[in-house]
From Swiss-Prot:
Top EC group: hydrolase
Cofactor requirement: Fe(2+)
CDD domains given in the database record: Pep_deformylase
Similarity comment: Belongs to the polypeptide deformylase family.
Organism of this sequence: Bacteroides fragilis (strain ATCC 25285 / DSM 2151 / CCUG 4856 / JCM 11019 / LMG 10263 / NCTC 9343 / Onslow / VPI 2553 / EN-2)
UniProt remark on cofactor binding: Binds 1 Fe(2+) ion.
Known catalytic reactions: N-terminal N-formyl-L-methionyl-[peptide] + H2O = N-terminal L-methionyl-[peptide] + formate
Protein name: Peptide deformylase
Binding sites annotated in the UniProt record for Fe cation: 98, 140, 144
Length: 184
C-alpha cells in the first residue's frame, strides 16, 4: 500500500525516533509498504518518520542506480533500530534531495565512511563499516531517525535562499507527483 509522505513542517520529522522490539505489530507489512511508497515516489531511501511513524526503521533500494553503480545490483534492505556510531573519512559534497522536501536539492557535505549498527528484518544484529554512496544515503536516512533533515547541513545563506520553498511547504502548498501529508 502506498502511504502519504510527510512533508517539511510535520512535527514527526523533527522527533527522535524510538527503537522497536521484535513484536512490533505488522512490521513485515510496514516494511513492504515503505518500499512500495519509496519506489512509487522514485526515492532511494525512506525513513519511518517520513510516513508519520517515530520509529527507527529505514528502507533503502539502490538497485535503481545499478547502471551507474553495478555494485548495488539487487541492493534492497531494511534497517531496524539503526545507529551511526562513527563518521570518518574525507568529507565529500554531493547534491541531495528528500521526499519530505519536494523540489529542494542542495549540496551537502558528509563523511565518506561510517560505522553502523542495525538489525535486519529478522532482528539479527549487524555492525558494518560502509563507504561511498551507500554511506551518504545511510547518513541522510538515519538523520531522519534523529529528527534531522539534510537542510540542517547547509549554510545559513543557502537556507535563506530556499526559505520561500520551505514557507510554501509550511503553508501546505507543496507540489509533487506522489501522495503527501502536508501541514494544514
Amino acid at each position: 500500500m502506498i502511504l502519504p509522505i510527510y512533508v517539511y513542517g510535520q512535527p514527526v520529522l523533527r522527533q527522535v525516533a524510538e527503537d522497536i522490539t521484535v513484536d512490533y505489530p505488522n512490521l513485515k507489512e510496514l516494511i513492504e509498504n515503505m518500499f512500495e511508497t519509496m519506489d512509487h515516489a522514485d526515492g532511494v531511501g525512506l525513513a519511518a518518520p517520513q510516513i508519520g511513524l517515530p520509529i527507527r526503521v529505514v528502507v533503502i533500494n539502490l538497485d535503481v542506480l545499478s547502471e551507474d553503480y553495478p555494485e548495488y545490483k539487487d541492493f534492497r534492505k531494511a534497517y531496524i533500530n539503526a545507529h551511526i556510531d562513527v563518521v570518518e573519512g574525507e568529507e565529500v559534497s554531493m547534491e541531495e534531495g528528500c521526499l519530505s522536501l519536494p523540489g529542494i536539492h542542495e549540496s551537502v557535505k558528509r563523511g565518506s565512511k561510517i560505522h553502523v549498527r542495525y538489525m535486519d528484518e529478522n532482528f539479527v544484529e549487524h555492525n558494518e563499516v560502509v563507504e561511498g554512496f551507500l554511506a551518504r544515503v545511510m547518513q541522510h536516512e538515519f538523520d531522519h531517525l534523529d529528527g534531522k533533515m539534510f537542510i540542517d547541513h547547509i549554510s545559513p545563506l543557502r537556507k535563506q535562499m530556499i526559505k520561500g520553498k520551505l514557507n510554501t511547504m509550511l503553508k501546505g502548498k507543496a507540489r509533487s507527483s506522489y501522495k503527501m501529508k502536508q501541514v494544514k
